[in-house]
From Swiss-Prot:
The gene is fusA. Keywords: Cytoplasm, Elongation factor, GTP-binding, Nucleotide-binding, Protein biosynthesis. It is found in: Cytoplasm. PANTHER family: RIBOSOME-RELEASING FACTOR 2, MITOCHONDRIAL (PTHR43261:SF1), TRANSLATION ELONGATION FACTOR G-RELATED (PTHR43261). Belongs to the TRAFAC class translation factor GTPase superfamily. Classic translation factor GTPase family. EF-G/EF-2 subfamily. InterPro entries: EFG_II, EFG_III, EFG_III/V, EFG_IV, EFG_V, EFG_V-like, EFTu-like_2, G_TR_CS. The lineage of its organism: Bacteria, Bacillati, Bacillota, Clostridia, Natranaerobiales. This is Elongation factor G. It comes from Natranaerobius thermophilus (strain ATCC BAA-1301 / DSM 18059 / JW/NM-WN-LF). Catalyzes the GTP-dependent ribosomal translocation step during translation elongation. During this step, the ribosome changes from the pre-translocational (PRE) to the post-translocational (POST) state as the newly formed A-site-bound peptidyl-tRNA and P-site-bound deacylated tRNA move to the P and E sites, respectively. Catalyzes the coordinated movement of the two tRNA molecules, the mRNA and conformational changes in the ribosome.
Length: 691
């Protein structure tokens, strides 16, 4: 089977936005116009094609990024729908890693919301070229120009409008196309009947001003166009498009479009822009990786986007499917792969057989015998592969850069209701943590309870909900708990000596360590400075293990210790009695003893909280934030409301949604995401230590 679409005619794009900016509706319309869906699904009816989990249809939000494929203008477009809720940043991070380009969807009224900022900066980190689509031009308070200003101020995105709206709110009738210098007026609500006309008189001046700005930006990427522009010569639409494409691919500018997906206005032009400005796999630099066993070498191995290169792909999502079992979504970066062949997972060091390959369309699927470079598909039969791992050809192994996932900040205890549920719960939680790296589970040694950890209350609610619906596990859920940690503030030296000698084989381990604090978020470092073999090499990993085990229970209140550097600099051993376990215990003793002397403190997660409230409730809401140990960073006006930016400890944020609702009579909204860990005040540390 040969390729259906050349690589240049492939687009791998994501649609990213704030919750409620209309992202799923926009995706729906794209699928409708590209002929994949014959009836439109509305998110607020709970009938949308992309939202195929029960929880999504009920809550009207998108949780798992479904990958879908469609075609437009002889080009294959693979779309990954990403969630806009802060608790699911991992899904966004995951999809950005495998995309080549993205559409940022903004609400014409809300503009650049806090979550859009987070996602935008995630995309900056991966150098993903973007176009922006200002949606909901038909709603009350829609303001295209305000959103463009916000993109400038908050995202430093260098927005370049290539369209302007004609009218707004109920009067939104059409779109000015600045590139062709014409206007499109829509005749009906299905968006299928429209006509191209001259730009309305009352808009000509504005259109000219914005067209000039656009040409000025485009001219920076094409010298010929620059000359024509300066000399006032005619410039063709194609020349403008190619120059803007150049700037967009370099992520130096963002073409801005507008429309109303719900009213079917502007979607086809958005599709054209995807093909005109966003990159094909051939436009992005070759993917880099390291050859297993040669990790220390400076030189990276490169794989060019071509079917003739050795096969390499990244598994970016694992889903448990009720019909086929474990589905592993992957993006092919080079080469091709046939169903039934073997791939190598260099991270696990295992060969696996790809049973079947499926191409997904939200929740309907097609079998593929072979997938090529640039394709996004799902494999059945990969039992050992986890999110973020590489798949490659066994003959030419490579490890592609993996993804970074944030640590979970909130935990709840969960208990099965019956004995039968107990067994099912363990396997179900295992499956869920395979799907989602920010969800972790462990058993509390003291209480024997199962503890689940995640990124926020909504995240854990969805998990518990899925246990019940998908896996039929009934469970009682405890109160959410904060993931406190401990660290040290002062450097110190410490000694650990473990000696048992009473007839027969004894035990002997003796270590001297230096402990010093690291900056927040640095984790743990272990340096071996042993010289002259005072501790034999084979025992050093045991010391490291002993210390890491001791770090699981801090000295103040038993929370995990973080951000510590350990240097092992001296010690001694006994020819006969020394062994690994003795050195492990000695390491652990040295760490516990040192921690007490190194000014230990308790840390708590601090959340970045942004609250939007009507002006009259501002005083009450700010008072409430202060009473929660919050620190207000700043305020700004936001179309009739006020936006309050603050940092509040997670411990004080439980149940905040209900409190805000009652304070503002349901008119306030807030978003919250993890920011950093900080020291707990003494009074609270005392409470935590007394528990």
């Amino acid at each position: 089977m040969t390729r259906k679409f050349p690589l240049e005619q492939t687009r791998n794009i994501g649609i990213m936005a704030h919750i409620d900016a209309g992202k799923t509706t926009t995706t729906e319309r794209i699928l409708f116009y590209t002929g994949r869906v014959h009836k439109l699904g509305e998110t607020h009816d709970g009938a949308s094609t992309m939202d195929f989990m029960d929880q999504e249809q009920e809550r009207g939000i998108t949780i798992t990024s479904a990958a879908t494929t469609c075609q437009w203008r002889d080009t294959r477009v693979n779309i990954i729908d990403t969630p806009g809720h802060v608790d699911f940043t991992v899904e966004v991070e995951r999809s950005l890693r495998v995309l080549d380009g993205a559409i940022g969807v903004f609400c014409a009224k809300g503009g650049v919301e806090p979550q859009s900022e987070t996602v935008w900066h995630q995309a900056d980190r991966y150098h993903v070229p973007r176009i922006a689509y200002i949606n909901k031009m038909d709603i009350m308070g829609a303001d295209f120009y305000n959103v463009v200003d916000m993109m400038n101020e908050r995202l430093q995105a260098n927005p370049v409008p290539i369209q302007l709206p004609i009218g707004k709110e109920d009067d939104f009738q059409g779109i000015v196309d600045l590139i062709k210098n014409t206007a499109v007026i829509y005749k009906d609500d299905l968006g299928t009947e429209w006509e191209e006309v001259e730009i309305p008189e009352d808009m000509q001046e504005l259109a000219e001003e914005y067209r000039d700005k656009m040409l000025e930006m485009a001219a920076e990427y094409d010298e010929e166009l620059m000359m024509k522009y300066l000399e006032g010569e005619e410039i063709t639409s194609e020349e403008i498009r190619l120059a803007l494409r150049e700037g967009c691919l370099k992520t130096e500018l963002t073409p801005v479009l507008c429309g109303s997906s719900y009213k079917n206005k502007g979607v086809q032009m958005l599709l054209n822009a995807v093909i005109d400005y966003l990159p094909a796999p051939t436009d992005v630099p070759p993917i880099e990786g390291v050859v297993p066993g040669k990790e220390d070498e400076e030189e990276k191995e490169q794989r060019v986007s071509s079917d003739d290169e050795p096969f390499s792909a990244l598994a970016f999502k694992i889903v448990t499917d009720p019909y086929v079992g474990k589905l592993c979504f992957f993006r092919v970066y080079s080469g091709k792969i046939e169903a039934g062949s073997y791939v190598y997972n260099p991270v696990k060091g295992k060969k696996e057989r790809v049973g079947r390959i499926l191409q997904m369309h939200a929740n309907h699927r097609e079998e593929r015998n072979v997938v090529y470079t640039g394709d996004i598909a799902a494999a059945v039969g990969l039992k050992n592969t986890s999110t973020g791992e590489t798949l490659c050809s066994p003959e030419k192994p490579i490890v592609l850069e993996s993804m970074q996932f944030p640590e979970p900040v909130i935990s709840v205890a969960i208990e099965p209701k019956t004995r039968a549920d107990q067994e099912k719960m363990a396997t179900s939680l295992q499956k869920l943590s395979e799907e989602d790296p920010t969800f972790q589970t462990h058993t509390d040694d003291e209480t024997g309870q199962t503890i689940i950890k995640g990124m926020g209350e909504l995240h854990l609610e969805v998990i518990v909900d899925r246990l019940l619906r998908e896996f039929k596990v009934e469970a009682n859920v405890g109160k959410p708990q904060v993931a406190y940690k401990e660290t040290i503030k002062a450097p110190t030296k410490s000694e650990g000596k473990f000696i048992r000698q009473s007839g027969g084989r004894g035990q002997y381990g003796h270590v001297l360590i230096e402990m010093e604090p690291l900056e927040r978020g640095a984790g743990y470092e272990f340096e071996d400075k042993i010289v002259g073999g005072v501790i034999p090499k084979e025992y050093i990993p045991a010391v490291d293990n002993g210390i890491q085990e001791a770090m699981q229970n801090g000295v103040l209140a038993g929370y995990p210790m973080v951000d510590v550097k350990i240097t092992l600099y001296d010690g001694s051993y006994h020819e006969v009695d020394s062994n690994e376990s003795a050195f492990k215990i000695a390491g652990s003793m040295a760490f516990k003893d040192g921690s007490k002397k190194a000014s230990p403190v308790i840390l708590e997660p601090i959340m970045k909280v942004e609250i939007v409230v009507p002006e009259e409730y501002m005083g009450d809401v700010m008072g409430d934030v202060n009473s929660r140990r919050g620190r207000i960073e700043g305020m700004e006006e936001r179309s009739g409301s006020r936006l309050i930016r603050s940092y509040v400890p997670l411990a004080e944020m439980f149940g905040y949604a209900t409190q805000l609702r009652s304070t503002t009579q349901g008119r306030g909204t807030y978003t919250m995401e993890f920011s950093h860990y900080d020291e707990v005040p003494d009074s609270i540390a005392k409470e935590l230590m007394d528990v």
